[in-house]
């Protein structure tokens, strides 16, 4: 069974009606979009624990050109893909969208060049790393710190990347020492952490660009 969820633009997308899925609220999505602004144009976006894909849909409407969404529940992943495709059809045919049904940790361990990512086959020579990562696991899942480490050690990100964590204001996750807190916002029971790589730690090759 599915409900409806309205994007900032007014477009409605499908939303799974189950206890395991907690859609990011309109207020929080709008805050993220306002903070990131024009940085989203032409950017790449990795959506972790994607759910309905609402946040990725918002990013798509603001200029993101490549999205990879990871969702562990098969039916929810199907809904996510449908939503992203529906939104992309109203924008531009040059957008690359991919939704993969997989468990978060096991997938991140494979790194961005793994064979399951179709983009790597379709776009040889392009940088597989991501400009933005949105991490929104169930608040009580404990799935915050290990993904932070894997994003760095498995080279999912660039020196200039931003990781946005949505979490509970009542139970803030620990920030891995490979990241630095750039910005923190509170919206009722929800908090947003905007993290950037700690460049003092040697997670990046010398050849890695800041762009």
Regions found by a protein language model. Give the residues of each.
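Class I S-adenosyl-L-methionine-dependent methyltransferase catalytic core
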Residues: 1-211
């Amino acid at each position: 069974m599915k409900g409806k969820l309205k994007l900032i633009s007014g477009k409605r997308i499908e939303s799974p009606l189950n206890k395991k899925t907690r859609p990011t609220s309109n207020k929080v999505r709008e805050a993220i979009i306002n903070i990131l602004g024009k940085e989203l144009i032409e950017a790449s976006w990795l959506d972790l624990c994607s759910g309905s894909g609402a946040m990725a849909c918002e990013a798509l409407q603001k200029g993101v050109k490549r999205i990879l969404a990871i969702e562990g529940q098969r039916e929810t992943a199907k809904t996510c893909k449908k939503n992203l495709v529906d939104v992309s059809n109203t924008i531009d045919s040059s957008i690359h969208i991919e939704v993969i049904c997989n468990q978060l940790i096991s997938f991140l361990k494979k790194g961005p060049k793994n064979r399951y990512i179709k983009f790597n086959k379709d776009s040889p020579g392009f940088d597989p790393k991501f400009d933005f990562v949105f991490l929104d696991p169930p608040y009580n899942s404990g799935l915050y710190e290990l993904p932070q480490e894997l994003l760095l050690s498995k080279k999912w990100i660039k020196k200039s990347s931003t990781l946005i964590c949505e979490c509970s204001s009542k139970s803030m996750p620990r920030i891995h020492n490979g990241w630095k807190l750039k910005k923190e916002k509170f919206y009722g029971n929800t908090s947003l952490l905007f993290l950037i790589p700690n460049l003092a730690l040697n997670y990046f090759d010398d050849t890695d660009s800041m762009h």
